[in-house]
Amino acid sequence: MECFKRLTTVFFTVKLVQYLLVYFAPGQFDTSTPLFLEKYQPLQPEKWYHKLLSWDSVYFVKNGLQAVTHTNAYGYVSLPEYEHEWMFSPFVWSQTLKTAGGATLRNWAAPIDTLLVRATLLNLVLHYVSVWLLYALTLRTFPKNRELAYKTSLLFILSSAAGFLLAPYSEPLSFAFSFLGMLLRMLAVEHNVYGGITLAWYNWLPYTLSGICFSVAAANRPNCVLLGVYYIYDVLKLVRQRNWVRAVLFPCIAGSMMLGIFAYMHYYLPSVVFCPERESWCKHSLPWIHIPYKSFYSFVQGYYWRNGFLNYWTWNNVPNFLFALPNLVILWYSTVYFSYQYPLESIRPLVYITRALLLIITFFAHVQIINRISSFIPLHLWYLSDRMIKTTGEAKGDDRLVYLYVNWLILWIPLQTVLFACFLPPA
């Protein structure tokens, strides 16, 4: 009960301070927000919370409004107005915002305000629920270590995503389902002293539900497709143990479900909508099914944002690498720590997932986004918490790194919150 009170108090105190920073922040540098508001709710007065419509949140809210105000195009989903808006969760998060906004939203004089406020409240709830999902996941991973669970949840509240979690970004939905999926899988899988795994038949349901959770997370944020590494790991373990039936009925079913939903969202549906007109994407297709071998998400990222191998490695992007450096370092150190100094077979797949994310973000993407999209991975939070517990006396080596990272967070969270409210980089 004491832990519940402390974490709840910290959570709402941090959020209150952040919203006060947004309130007192000066006007926005960019004109995207006033132009967006002028188009979709003209003659409405400017409000302080319009500052939350910064960067990608403009597109998330627009896609949500599109889902409410337009007729469903394919029976159950409304398509984005422009192709670059497919980047911003046009189905899962947009449909969630549609539900939050309500069917009568199109008749309101200020639909953006209504959607913005409700989506922001929804993200607050998702973040708060995720704090406790992570607490439960930590206790399952490190049994009876309540201090570690408490510190991990505390660090998750003080996330480097900072201001992004105040606005209608799609990250909270993904990390909520990611943590829930990890917890369900951890409840279903037993690890033995020989490095093998055991999957009891009565655990088939929670294991399969983990696949549904990961599918929702990946459909919402494509980087979460890396969670499929859990099922690859389990298949290899079960095949090595010659447990063929369970290999098929547990990880193969859960993983196939996840892969199928991801393929439908990012390959099949865009090919139906854009091919053959979008020749630059459609012409590179698989010969036997006539679907492009490159996901539409990757194509749009490359075409509009110049994502690709080393494309971001230019001198003018050095500041963005500096913004990302603390998380790049701490994520890498966490994989080393849980591979050699504190090896745990149960979190080995998460080590692989973290390393894969680091490689993708460092060499193929806009590197500064690591500060928010790494929020679905708890590995570095466990590393930080464990070292904070074990540190006695003067911090040295890894402990010095942890000390510097926590102090960076204390500086970064208010700074990034104000920058976000002013529509200033980093995005």
Curated annotation (Swiss-Prot):
Copy the pathway line from the protein's UniProt record.
Glycolipid biosynthesis; glycosylphosphatidylinositol-anchor biosynthesis
Do the record's keywords include Membrane?
yes
Record organism: Eremothecium gossypii (strain ATCC 10895 / CBS 109.51 / FGSC 9923 / NRRL Y-1056) (Yeast)
Function, please?
Answer: Mannosyltransferase involved in glycosylphosphatidylinositol-anchor biosynthesis. Transfers the second mannose to the glycosylphosphatidylinositol during GPI precursor assembly.
Query: Where mainly located?
Result: endoplasmic reticulum
Write down the top EC class of this protein. Answer: transferase
Q: Which InterPro entries match?
A: PIG-V/Gpi18
User: What is the protein's name according to its record?
Assistant: GPI mannosyltransferase 2
GO molecular function annotation: alpha-1,6-mannosyltransferase activity; glycolipid mannosyltransferase activity; mannosyltransferase activity
Domain of life, source organism: Eukaryota
Q: Which UniProt keywords apply?
A: Endoplasmic reticulum, Glycosyltransferase, GPI-anchor biosynthesis, Membrane, Transferase, Transmembrane, Transmembrane helix
* Compartment(s): Endoplasmic reticulum membrane
Q: How does it sit in the membrane?
A: Multi-pass membrane protein
